[in-house]
Amino acid sequence: MDHAADAHRTDLMTITRHVLNEQSRNPESRGDFTILLSHIVLGCKFVASAVNKAGLAQLIGLAGETNVQGEEQKKLDVLSNEVFVKALVSSGRTCVLVSEEDEETTFVDPKLRGKYCVCFDPLDGSSNIDCGVSIGTIFGIYMIKDKDNVTLSDVLQPGKDMLAAGYCMYGSSCTLVLSTGTGVNGFTLDPSLGEFILTHPDIKIPKKGKIYSVNEGNAKNWDVPVAKFVEKCKYPKDGSPPKSLRYIGSMVADVHRTLLYGGVFLYPADQKSPNGKLRVLYEVFPMSFLMEQAGGQSFTGKERALDLVPTKIHERSPIFLGSYDDVEEIKALYAEQAKSSSA
């Protein structure tokens, strides 16, 4: 019997154990973050289970309501939102929540308040539910200055002040990718154990990628730098092979592939959406945080995405994120345009 191999198989690094190990390095930590994260993980497990049996349980289809973004809500959207709000409030570690599905900020009852703010999209890519494409949950966590005196300004912090961010992708497997500010790690749900196990330690995005991810259906409305970049991806003039286009239409799935294989994900501003389409607090910031922690970059077309200071909870922004060199190319094209327009 191979005891060494057997020991390796049973020495599983769960997400809770991983976060506890990280927290033990901070002598001031009291375990609050671990408790909060365990409630987020529980919410992810619940939604993963609901997604797996959505067709059988008749959770697919419209719930007959429209959310704050003007999108008709899917039944699974509504359920996922309820699950995460209840999980986060019951943790006793949050004081304010921002959800993509709720028009207003949720301020937690003072008796149940903790020191964290969580901004989340409970079910990103929900328009893909019916056809079985990967969908996911995105979240970002901030520390609040004073839990007894919480205001909207506690929510409207720049992304660079984020404490942790992550997403959970519900696809062929259920994968949770997390950063607490010391790198990025990926965990896969083992259905037999009911635990997220570390399967992708210390994720690093390649410095340059071979893939670009964008909705080319919007091409006629793009500005010059975006059009030039995509043209260069398709018809490079330096003798290099063209980049491959991969676009799913679910941000979690597109960013996950970009993170693992390299390349760039683009959702630019255009004539139809001059402020971009993706929401700052619970889409742009968490994904930018993860990308930078993995060695990549994020850019809005004007500045580093994490330097943005939002003025409202459902604010939108253009976003370019991915491999360092690819985003650098996009930044150079925008700088070139700014220079020529000021000349």
Curated annotation (Swiss-Prot):
Reactions that this protein is recorded to catalyse: beta-D-fructose 1,6-bisphosphate + H2O = beta-D-fructose 6-phosphate + phosphate
Signal sequence coordinates: none
InterPro entries linked: FBPase_C_dom, FBPase_class-1, FBPase_N, FBPtase, Fructose_bisphosphatase_AS
CDD domains documented for this protein: FBPase
Listed cofactors: Mg(2+)
Gene3D superfamilies: 3.40.190.80, Fructose-1,6-Bisphosphatase, subunit A, domain 1
Keyword Cytoplasm annotated: yes
EC number(s) given by UniProt: 3.1.3.11
Protein known as: Fructose-1,6-bisphosphatase, cytosolic
Phylogenetic placement of the source organism: Eukaryota, Viridiplantae, Streptophyta, Embryophyta, Tracheophyta
Gene name per UniProt: CFBP
